[in-house]
UniProtKB/Swiss-Prot annotation:
Molecular function in Gene Ontology: ATP binding; protein homodimerization activity; protein kinase activity; protein serine kinase activity; protein serine/threonine kinase activity
Disulphides: none
Organism: Arabidopsis thaliana
Topological relation to the membrane, as annotated: Single-pass type I membrane protein
Subcellular location: Membrane
Gene transcribed to yield this protein: CCR4
GO cellular component: membrane
Membership in a protein family: Belongs to the protein kinase superfamily. Ser/Thr protein kinase family.
Official protein name in the record: Serine/threonine-protein kinase-like protein CCR4
Transmembrane segments: 367-387
Length: 751
């Protein structure tokens, strides 16, 4: 195991040198596709990049899934597309900045209710592949593997191509072409593979002889040589090496290519479930087969559209052999689509070529390895020591497609490997369970502070004397059913991952600091700095706590606003908290307020995304949720502004967001207080537990009331940004600390 780790770390430093020397062995195998197939219920959605690289989709039965792009995305050039059960994702790559953005659309069981979400923005992805439930990609420069939806992988590798099944992953390494898999047995050995593909429960690879080898739940294979493969559910198809036509097999020998397609030559083929699609070489039109409901066994998704031509492959910066004829005009920007044939008409990576270079390659590879080890031995030792722990990490799950969990994950992804590799300043510690148990006297009731949405919270003292707050998730409950328990566990895992990822990259005096974590199969624990004075909700709503003065309330409001402003304005992409409330604003020993609990947080859109919001199911706490977000499921930073407006009303009135009126009937704080503010009668709703504001405080209190009303505007576009909120609170606090001015407070922009 140690040897594997050191070689992996070593290769990350010298991969460019190795590739330069081994350029004779360049593989023409790509896992970035321009066609995708998605199934949900009895409906199918086929998407492809047309000859302008625009994303277009067609469903079967016709128009059963009303998928369409909006705004600037209609004319946005995509570099690839992948799909799975109920989702479609498009990759946008910017060559000028070497970055990629991955946008995903998820649709409901009936094919409606499209939800749009960006799940990645970072270093350029050169390879991208999706199974039915998850997505993985490979960065172009570092060859680092990234996956979305939790996925168990033992280590990052320098993958040239990847393939995903329902519960397994396979990768084809950089030359010399070895296959490694997780979640599937009987993986072939050797270093003579040039392409790889996966279906639901089986995977196949093409050798340098152009033979096919399959593993998993395999079917009998035709004795043919292949140029390209597509593997579906218990079936597969391949492009013949000899002439570019297609042959299919599987389904207990009951699956074959429709007779009408026997003589058609294909440039590329794709599969998902029972269905296959191929790009015809003659005119680059897309033809699909495999669905028993297709008329004559064939479906042409884009027939009748103005642009029936689809991209026959991904646009690349360079090709090992020649580019596909005419592809430069399709790609532009000096990009090209790679042809699998060399200029002499032969197919690459045949045994003849391999035999010709075999003696040279074996000898020179040996000299190369010995020379590199001798020359860079010192760097190798240093690299091994630095990355010894990190290279054992499992691959980072860079985001979630959504909150749905379709498989059982044995253990959460450890984030420290990726955080360290990105140079993250979070400095998170991974605590041991023994250390945390010792800090809390075995999680004793004496140290128990309360119960939150994530689980129980304990006060503890670490061995170095630091006072900490420890959140321990409650993953099991004998009173809940199995299904409910699985959903509950998934929610806890999601909150754990969100908190870990969000807090590890945030650093602000008005955000609670995450110190570290512990996780294993049965435990999810987060360790924070200890906040001695509890939460704002405690001091506003718990009679056992002394009420706060008006000046202290304004200072707390300003502190919390500055923390939220940092999330919205100083983090790229911005972080939307989604659960701003008084119980998530904590107070330290000096009464400095800090925002906490990032379990529901989401990364918001940036200007580069060409979208103004995220389409997500509403989440948060009743009474604080933005009505526009709740109704239209469109999340923006202004949703946090609304929630903060409710907190301001709590500070003014002392009431909870949802509380009982004089008749013991539930009452919404916004509906109760805002009308008084608009009538300039805010004095009627002020907290009666403390004396009325002094002449030095009345202007500031009125100012906060008007600001709260602005934050609670029904239309999110009319709400102030957190920059404006901070500015107005600073003015209010200044008014509170000095003699009142003669002019009155402005209510402009309020309703």
């Amino acid at each position: 195991m140690a040897l594997t780790i050191s070689i992996s770390c070593f290769s990350s430093y010298f991969v460019s040198l190795l590739l330069l020397v081994l350029s004779s062995f360049s593989f023409v195998c790509f896992s970035l596709s321009t066609v995708s197939i998605s199934h949900i219920s009895n409906q199918t959605l086929v998407c492809a990049l047309n000859n302008h690289s625009y994303l277009q989709c067609s469903s079967f039965p016709l128009n059963s899934i009303p998928f369409s792009l909006t705004g600037n995305l209609r004319n946005r050039r995509f570099s690839g597309v992948v799909s799975g059960n109920g989702f479609v994702c498009g990759l946008i790559s910017r060559l000028d900045s070497n970055t990629s953005t991955l946008l995903c659309w998820r649709f409901s069981v009936d094919g409606t209710n499209m939800l749009h979400k960006r799940i990645y923005h970072g270093p350029e992805l050169e390879e991208l592949e999706a199974g039915n439930f998850r997505i993985c990609g490979v960065e172009r420069v570092s060859r680092r593997l990234r996956c979305w939806q939790p996925y168990y992988l033992p280590r990052p590798d320098n993958y040239r191509s990847i393939a995903l099944g329902d519960n397994f992953f396979c990768g084809l390494s950089q030359p010399p072409g070895m296959i490694s898999c997780e979640g599937i047995a009987k993986v072939p050995s050797g270093d003579h593979y040039i392409a790889i593909a996966a279906g639901s429960r089986q995977a196949c690879a093409i050798t340098v002889d152009n033979d096919v080898e399959c593993w998993g739940q395999t079917q009998s294979l035709p004795r043919e040589k292949f140029l390209a493969l597509a593997v579906g559910e218990d079936r597969g198809c391949g492009v013949r090496w000899s002439n570019g036509t297609v042959v299919c097999w599987g389904n207990n020998n009951n699956f074959s290519l429709p007779q009408t397609l026997k003589d058609i030559h294909f440039t590329s083929i794709y599969a998902k479930g029972p269905m296959f699609c191929g790009v015809a070489t003659r005119n680059y039109t897309l033809i699909c087969w495999g669905n028993e409901n297709f008329k004559s066994g064939v479906f042409t998704p884009f027939q009748g559209l103005i642009s029936q031509v689809v991209m026959p492959g991904p646009c690349r910066r360079e090709c090992p052999y020649r580019p596909l004829s005419g592809s430069q005009s399709l790609c532009g920007n000096e990009l090209m689509i790679c042809d699998l044939k060399r200029n002499d008409g032969e197919f690459p990576d045949t045994r003849a070529q391999n035999s010709k270079n075999k003696t040279w390659s074996r000898r020179n590879i040996a000299f190369l390895v010995v020379g590199c080890v001798g020359t860079f031995s010192l760097l190798l030792v240093i690299s091994f020591l630095i990355f010894k722990s990190h290279c054992r990490c499992r691959v980072h799950d860079s985001g979630r497609l959504d909150d749905t969990r379709t498989i059982d994950i044995p253990k959460l992804e450890k984030r420290l490997c990726t955080l360290a590799s990105l140079g993250n300043p979070g400095q998170l510690m991974e605590f041991s369970i023994d250390e945390l148990a010792l800090a809390t006297d075995g999680f004793s009731v004496r140290f128990h502070l309360g119960i939150g949405s994530f689980g129980s919270v304990y006060q503890g003292v670490l061995s170095d004397g630091r006072h900490v707050a420890i959140k321990r998730a409650e993953l099991t409950n004998p009173t809940l059913s199995g299904t409910t328990m699985r959903h509950r566990r998934a929610d806890k895992d999601s909150a754990f991952v969100n908190e870990l990822e969000s807090m590890s990259r945030l650093n602000h005096k008005n955000l609670v600091r995450l110190l570290g974590f512990y996780e294993d199969t049965e435990e999810r624990i987060l360790v924070y700095e200890y906040m001695k004075n509890g939460s704002l909700a405690d001091h506003l709503h718990n009679p056992q706590f002394d009420p706060l003065s008006w000046q202290t309330r304004l200072m707390i409001a300003l502190d919390a606003a500055r923390g939220i402003q940092y999330l919205h304005e100083f983090i790229v992409p911005p972080v939307i908290h989604r659960d701003i409330k008084s119980s998530n604003i904590l107070l330290d020993a000096t009464w400095t307020a800090k925002v906490s609990d990032f379990g529901l947080s989401q990364m918001g859109p940036t200007e580069e995304d060409d979208v103004s919001h995220l389409s997500l199911h509403a989440a948060g706490t009743l009474g604080y949720i933005d009505p526009e977000y709740y109704k239209f499921q469109q999340l923006t930073t202004k949703s946090d502004v609304y929630s903060f407006g409710v907190v301001l009303l709590e500070l003014l009135s002392g009431h909870k967001a949802i509380h009982n009126n004089e008749d013991e009937n539930p009452r919404n704080l916004v509906e109760y207080v805002v009308p008084y503010i608009l009538l300039d009668e805010a004095h009627r709703i002020l907290d009666q537990r403390i004396p009325p504001p002094t002449p030095y405080e009345i202007e500031a209190v009125a100012h906060v009331g008007y600001l709260a009303a602005e934050c609670l505007m029904p239309c999110s576009r009319k709400r102030p940004s957190m920059v404006e909120v901070v500015s107005k609170l600073e003015s209010a606090l200044a008014a509170c600390l000095t003699a009142p001015k003669t002019e009155t407070v402005s209510r402009s922009n309020t309703y």
